[in-house]
Structures are given as C-alpha cells and as structure tokens.
C-alpha cells in the first residue's frame, strides 16, 4: 500500500528518472550570482527530509503551507517535499501587495510559511502578522522564525507516504476570477500526474534536454511547462533568479539550452538585443514556446527570423484547466494565430451565450486535470464548474481543420505580460485616492506586454492631481503589472443612454489616444 501511495503522490513524480540517472545534474541554480547544482539524488534526499521535518513539526496531511519564495532550488524542494508529507503547498505570487498576500494566507488557514527574505520586501512582516504554527526562514535568522536549513538537518525517522485518493488535493495555485480577486484552485495528485504524462505525449522532453527558466516559479508557465516535464524525463534546467534580456540570452548560450518557454514580453525584450543575440552560439537551442497571453503573429515571425533554426510555437493554457489545445499528433503545421487542435484525451466544447454548442463561443474543458473547485469560493465554483466542465471564460472559434483561434474574453479581463488584470480592480485602486471622482480603465495595445491598463480619470474640482502622481499612487498600493501605464485627466466620462459609463466608447478613445505610444514603449 505504501508503494501505491508513493506512485499516486505528485511529490514523487520523477521516481523513474531518479532510478535511471540519480547522479545526473537536474538543476543549475543561479540564485545569488553563483552556480548551485543539484543532482536527482540530492533533490530526492532533501524533499524526503522536508517531508520528515513536517511530520516532526506536527504538520498533518491536508494542512496548507504558504510559500513566499523566489526563483531558487528551495522552492522546488519545498513544493514537492510538502506533498510527500501530504501537506498542501500554496506557491504564492510574490508580486502581489502585502495586504493581498496576507488575506490569501489567512483565508487558506495556513499553518506554516516558508519565507525567503529576498522575495518580497514585506515577507517577514506578512508571516509575523498571521497566526501560523510555524515560520521557516531561508538564509537568515529572525525572532519568531525557525532557520530552514537547521530544521532540515534535525534527525527525524523515515515516514510512509500518506494515503492518496482520487480527489486528494496536491497543491493550491492562485488565479484570478471574474471579480479579479485571487482564488485558490484545488488541484489533485491524480490530475497532476495525469497531466505530466499528457504533456510528455504532445510536448515531449528527453534526458538530453536542458531548459531555461527565467519566469517566476509560482507561474504555471514555469512549473507546468518546464520543471515537471524536464524532471519527469530525466533532463535538466537552468534556474535564473529573474528575467533580464541579455542575461537570458547568455544563459541559453552558456548552458547550451535546448528549449525555453516564456510570455510574449520575454521574447519581445530580447529581440531588442539582436546584435548581442547574433554574437552568441545558440546552435543547441531547438524550440521555444510563447504562452500565457495572446501572441501577435508578428512576434512569432520576428523570433523565427532572429533564430531560423529554432521551432517557435504558441500555447494556450489555464492554471485550473491545463492546456487542452495542442499540436496535431500527425505533424500537420499549426496555422499562425492558433495554439492547435483539441486533444483526444480532453473533452472540449464551444457554447454560445445560451449554453448551446456553437462554432464560436466560450471554451469548456473537461479532463482529470481540471480543478475540483476554488477554495472557500462556493459561488465561483458553481459558476465555473458544471458536471466536471470548466467554463474557461475564453471565446474561441474553430476552423474546418479543427484548429482553434482565440477571439476574446467573456468578461473584460485582459492579460498584461502573462498576468491577469481586471479593469474594476484598477478602478477601485484609483477610486481610493481622495482626489479621484470617477475613473474607467481599459486595455491598450503594447509592444512588449500585449496589453497594458490605461485610464480616464475625473479629478475632484480644484484638484491639481497629475497623471504621474496617480501612476505612482497605484504602483505603491497595488501589483506593478496592474498599474495604469497611461492616464488621461478628463472633465467627464462617456456615458450611455442609461447613464452608465460607456466602456466601449472609453476603450475606443483610450486606444486612439495611447495605442501608438504604447506600441513604442518597450520594457515598461
């Protein structure tokens, strides 16, 4: 029974690679400016030590543990080591404001937090403000925190893998819903292991592959797109602390990486360094995938021109629904603007506003990967999940050859550099300023981010508040990716016949005023 539970636990997903290549380097970590290499054997040993530490500290199966950690090997060790003890890790978006992170950890009733003091300026104060049973600290010591490495070194007996049922939760990533409020997706061990095998069929990795991660590890693009497939196959990857275009290109060349994944901004920004790119030996690079947001065909073309020997593709996926669209297994080329066709292992539907099957409509997905629901969000769970079908909120159409094409969102959410932005969320931030009377936010095109927030603001009479002051205000109080890049101070907002803000008119005016500027503003 213990062996069965081990095989059903996502924390042991790379067991086959561990047996084949135990002493092969799995991760080359560049955190702190120096290389730290971890073999498969070392990863397994430290994950097992984390599971034993959890039992010694009284962390029980089913309890949630928070992760305020940046891009470093400890993130991966803790993430999967937690699952080996039956705990449920929360890989948190360290770009969020302190108040939002505090709310998430408190709402999830986390009993422990692993804190990386370099990940968030308020990381320690966030952990201190919550009624956690235990607080673990990386790299440092501080009152009220246990030093992570010292605790890991404490002797602890071997443990049996906990019982894993079909619906046992593995981890809880956070995504944004129709309200823009982060919500925790309940992801199961069974669904995640099913997806690892599914991913290997359509986007196969090999022992000879070496990936490069510059995106945040809390993001699905990194965990689902590189960490799991590479470790499952027995390959290796380079882990960068963050993204900087020249360092990224240098990493691809120096470590002879065979593939890399990223959001559109990653590719747009490194294309600004074409001369440097051309000076590097990138002959090992075989494929690159762009995902997490709509990809302009012009960007795909530009990357292929810069790297003609590299296969460049786009992908579509959701935190709570996986990647239901994939390249055809028969090798047919994927048309520009399409992430692919429906996989036979995954049920998909397009429905119109009446819930009827249609040639164009909202994409619905059903497969073992789909989340069971959203933690402490019964109403959103009822809205998004019906009989196992996930309502993605994305409008697609399908051509006669079965290829899908993204059209828009059901709601007005948009993606800014791979991060979900909700206009209402940004508007509420603007409304919090005492000099703001009214505001409307809409997406405008941007060369790097795809879309960025722009705002029309009506100020209090007599106020001298400026657009730059309001930008700084939003940057200080909300996530950086959601702050309005452009603000127009106007005497009034466009209204429709019912006296409500005419968002369509506001969008048209903002795009007319700022689209050209936004397209030329790179790296914001």
Where does each model-flagged region fall?
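Conserved pre-ATP/AMP-binding loop-to-beta segment of ANL
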Residues: 7, 22-25, 155-174, 181, ...
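AMP-binding/adenylate-forming catalytic core of the ANL superfamily
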Residues: 96, 113, 260, 361, ...
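AMP-binding/adenylate-forming catalytic domain of the ANL superfamily
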Residues: 478-500, 517, 522-524
């Amino acid at each position: 029974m213990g062996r069965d539970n081990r095989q059903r636990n996502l924390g042991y997903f790379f067991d086959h690679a561990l047996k084949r290549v135990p002493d092969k380097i799995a991760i080359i970590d560049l955190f702190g400016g120096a290389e730290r290499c971890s073999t498969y054997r070392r990863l397994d040993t430290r994950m097992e030590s984390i599971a034993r530490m959890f039992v010694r500290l009284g962390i029980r199966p089913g309890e949630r543990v928070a992760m305020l950690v940046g891009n470093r090997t400890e993130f991966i060790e803790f993430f999967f080591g937690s699952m080996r003890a039956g705990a449920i890790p929360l890989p948190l978006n360290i770009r969020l404001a302190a108040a939002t992170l505090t709310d998430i950890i408190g709402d999830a009733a986390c009993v422990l937090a692993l804190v990386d003091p370099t990940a968030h300026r308020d990381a320690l104060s966030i952990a201190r403000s919550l009624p956690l049973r235990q607080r673990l600290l990386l790299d440092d010591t501080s009152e009220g925190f246990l030093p992570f490495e010292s605790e890991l070194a404490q002797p602890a007996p071997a443990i049996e893998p906990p019982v894993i049922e079909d619906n046992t939760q593995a981890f809880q990533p956070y995504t944004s819903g129709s309200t823009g409020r982060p919500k925790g997706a309940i992801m199961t061990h069974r669904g995640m292991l099913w997806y690892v095998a599914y991913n290997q069929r359509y986007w196969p990795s090999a022992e000879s592959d070496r990936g490069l991660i510059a995106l945040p590890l809390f993001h699905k693009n990194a965990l689902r797109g590189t960490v799991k497939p590479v470790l499952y196959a027995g390959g290796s990857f380079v882990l960068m602390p963050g993204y900087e275009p020249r360092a990224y290109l240098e990493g691809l060349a120096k470590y002879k990486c065979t593939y890399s994944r990223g959001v559109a901004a990653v590719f747009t920004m490194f294309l600004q360094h074409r001369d440097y790119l051309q000076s590097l030996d990138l002959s090992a690079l075989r494929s690159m995938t762009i995902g997490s947001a709509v990809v302009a065909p012009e960007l795909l073309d530009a990357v292929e021109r810069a790297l003609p020997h590299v296969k460049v593709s786009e992908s579509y996926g959701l935190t709570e629904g996986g990647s239901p669209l994939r390249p055809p297994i028969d090798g047919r080329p994927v048309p520009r603007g399409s992430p692919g066709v429906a996989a036979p292992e995954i049920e998909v539907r397009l429905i119109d506003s009446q819930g009827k099957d249609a040639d164009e409509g909202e994409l619905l997905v059903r497969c073992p990967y789909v989340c069971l629901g959203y933690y402490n969000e019964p109403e959103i769970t009822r809205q998004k999940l019906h009989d196992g079908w996930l309502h993605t909120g994305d409008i697609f159409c399908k051509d006669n050859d079965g290829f899908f094409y993204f059209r828009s969102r059901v709601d007005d959410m948009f993606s800014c550099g791979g991060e979900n932005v909700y206009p209402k969320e940004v508007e509420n931030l603007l409304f919090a300023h005492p000099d703001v009377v009214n505001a409307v936010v809409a997406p405008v095109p941007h060369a790097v981010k795809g879309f960025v927030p722009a705002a029309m603001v009506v100020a209090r009479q007599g106020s001298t508040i400026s657009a730059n002051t309001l930008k700084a205000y939003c940057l200080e109080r909300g996530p950086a990716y959601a702050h309005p890049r452009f603000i127009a101070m106007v005497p009034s907002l466009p209204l429709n016949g019912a006296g409500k803000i005419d968002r369509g008119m506001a969008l048209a005016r903002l795009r007319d005023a700022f689209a050209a500027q936004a397209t030329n503003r790179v790296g914001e």
